[in-house]
């Protein structure tokens, strides 16, 4: 899969891929990266990519021309724009988007991008949460990371995907490692007795409790009549 990042700050993104799982994915040719700077396409003699908003408004906006031309320089691709106005990105989106061969992230700056770019060029609009950031680069990295983990050959143990949070609509159960006792704090005794049926039942119950406490919104969806019917 190829990921394209349209950004005026490519050096904010590149270091994230220098280590760990994503670095291995690049070395294994599972993913490829391409960075496109709108300044390289600016028709302005000073290579400006921003301007004041028509009809007023605070701050500057990324101009249509450089971004249009940056997009047109790419082959066929699925284009995503990161903005607080977008739909919230979820694990289901990550799994779905992992089926694409080529994805492009438009990383906005200032007050965003000219609306005509969204209307004419963008396939999907996402946000990663109800908060404001200085640009779309971190959001694009979050999405790229989540999507990449769903590609074949990226994770050492592909079964890890089956037991992660959100896979079954709830958070993952609490996890422990050795030693069994640390600073007087013990691992749950049932986890040490080898009864896998009881362990799985306990983990499921703990996952439900964790979801109810930390993510009541997810818990309500689990308890909805539609979800209950699906379980049957």
UniProtKB/Swiss-Prot annotation:
GO molecular function annotation: tRNA (guanine(37)-N1)-methyltransferase activity
Reaction catalysis annotation: guanosine(37) in tRNA + S-adenosyl-L-methionine = N(1)-methylguanosine(37) in tRNA + S-adenosyl-L-homocysteine + H(+)
SUPFAM superfamilies recorded: alpha/beta knot
Statement: the UniProt record of this protein carries the keyword S-adenosyl-L-methionine: yes
A GO cellular-component term linked to this record: cytosol
Subcellular location: Cytoplasm
One Pfam family matching this protein: tRNA_m1G_MT
Domain of life: Bacteria
Binding site residues for S-adenosyl-L-methionine: 108, 128-133
EC number: 2.1.1.228
GO-annotated biological processes: tRNA N1-guanine methylation
Keywords: Cytoplasm, Methyltransferase, S-adenosyl-L-methionine, Transferase, tRNA processing
Protein function: Specifically methylates guanosine-37 in various tRNAs.
Record-linked PANTHER family: TRNA (GUANINE-N(1)-)-METHYLTRANSFERASE
Family: Belongs to the RNA methyltransferase TrmD family.
Assembly notes: Homodimer.
HAMAP family to which the protein is assigned, alphabetical: TrmD (MF_00605)
Name the record gives this protein: tRNA (guanine-N(1)-)-methyltransferase
């Amino acid at each position: 899969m190829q990921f394209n990042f349209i950004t005026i700050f490519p050096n904010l993104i590149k270091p994230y891929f220098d280590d760990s799982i994503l670095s291995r994915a690049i070395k294994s040719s599972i993913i490829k990266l391409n960075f496109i700077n709108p300044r390289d396409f600016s028709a302005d003699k000073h290579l400006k990519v921003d301007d004041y908003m028509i009809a007023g408004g605070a701050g500057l906006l990324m101009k249509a021309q450089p971004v249009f031309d940056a997009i047109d320089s790419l082959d066929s691709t699925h284009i995503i724009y990161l903005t607080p106005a977008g739909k919230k990105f979820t694990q289901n989106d990550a799994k779905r988007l992992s089926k694409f061969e080529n994805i492009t992230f438009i990383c906005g700056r200032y007050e965003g991008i000219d609306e005509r770019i969204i209307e004419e060029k963008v396939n999907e609009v996402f946000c990663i949460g109800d908060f404001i950031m200085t640009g779309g680069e971190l959001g694009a990295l979050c999405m790229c990371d989540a999507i990449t983990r769903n590609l074949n050959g990226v994770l050492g143990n592909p079964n890890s995907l089956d037991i992660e949070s959100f896979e079954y609509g709830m958070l993952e159960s609490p996890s422990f490692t050795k030693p069994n006792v640390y600073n007087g704090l013990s691992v749950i005794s049932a986890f040490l007795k080898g009864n896998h049926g009881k362990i799985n039942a306990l983990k499921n119950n703990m996952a439900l409790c964790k979801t109810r406490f930390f993510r009541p919104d997810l818990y309500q969806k689990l308890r909805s009549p539609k979800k209950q019917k699906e379980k049957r």
